[in-house]
């Protein structure tokens, strides 16, 4: 029996990890241990740990790693301490983390420093913020890489990672997107009390390196949404530095045409996204999930500036007029053909590709002592 310790810190990463967590939980030779922390535990963001515990995983650990406004460095330290103590107790064979959040960095650090295998999902990607540095740091602490596409493979090889330890599995959330068990739009509207026939979705997160400018950017952004006259479904920003100023502005604009939620269940969010007129903000969902559904999206500012921009994506700066104009353009475009460029075009599900890796004995024989692989210089 192999024990895998996984960590989820946000509504977003849990939604993406769910298919893989279900596979591990139901595997006769694997034992899932899941830490639920970060935004999941915070009242401001809807205490989404309840969404995780609803899945009834056999081994789940709830940990509140921060108080509102606590510095990110302190939160990282809190998280490392908890994961380290739990890891010593349960002795996992592998630590599995996702993405570029500090909870993932904490898990990778603990795994690497305790000579346990670290498996990183969706490394090798680019955005446009400090998240890049965190993601690449996690990759350098990891032994096994489960990436979305060939571009990610190339970047990890450039970073000195061994090619045979990098596996393309696509993006796991796309398994959820293609699921036949998603609720209907009518069910979602009834659950959240949404009266709109037509609407756009807004997700606007802080950029930590621009935190001092977030009050100005947030004011300009939400003013543009109001001026557009569109019905807007907005989701609260994540809890990175600068979130308070965004949330303060967001709450000013709540009205019959602007409804905000601390969180929306991932599957329900996907249904809303699929039927939206457009998506606007700086979330990766506008770069990845929206194009797969053919939904036009407006990417605002620098947070996603280094990611692949498909033909359904309109990029703009933080100026109110430019955001307003981009929304008008998106509304005039209608739906696009589905774009699965990010996923590499493989017809297999991410879960199938994940199973291939996790059931391979060679995966478990990877040395915990990493070597830097030089390019041919």
Swiss-Prot record:
InterPro entries: UDP-GlcNAc_Epase, UDP_GlcNAc_Epimerase_2_dom, WecB-like. One of its GO terms (biological process) is carbohydrate metabolic process. Keywords: Hydrolase, Isomerase. It catalyses: UDP-N-acetyl-alpha-D-glucosamine + H2O = aldehydo-N-acetyl-D-mannosamine + UDP + H(+). GO terms for molecular function: hydrolase activity, hydrolyzing O-glycosyl compounds; isomerase activity. Its EC number is 3.2.1.183. Changing residue 131 to Q: Strongly decreased activity. It is an enzyme of class 3 (hydrolase). The active site is at 212. Belongs to the UDP-N-acetylglucosamine 2-epimerase family. Homodimer. NCBIfam families: NeuC_NnaA (TIGR03568). PANTHER family: UDP-N-ACETYLGLUCOSAMINE 2-EPIMERASE. Catalyzes the conversion of UDP-N-acetylglucosamine (UDP-GlcNAc) to UDP and N-acetyl-D-mannosamine (ManNAc). This is UDP-N-acetylglucosamine 2-epimerase. It comes from Neisseria meningitidis serogroup B (strain ATCC BAA-335 / MC58).
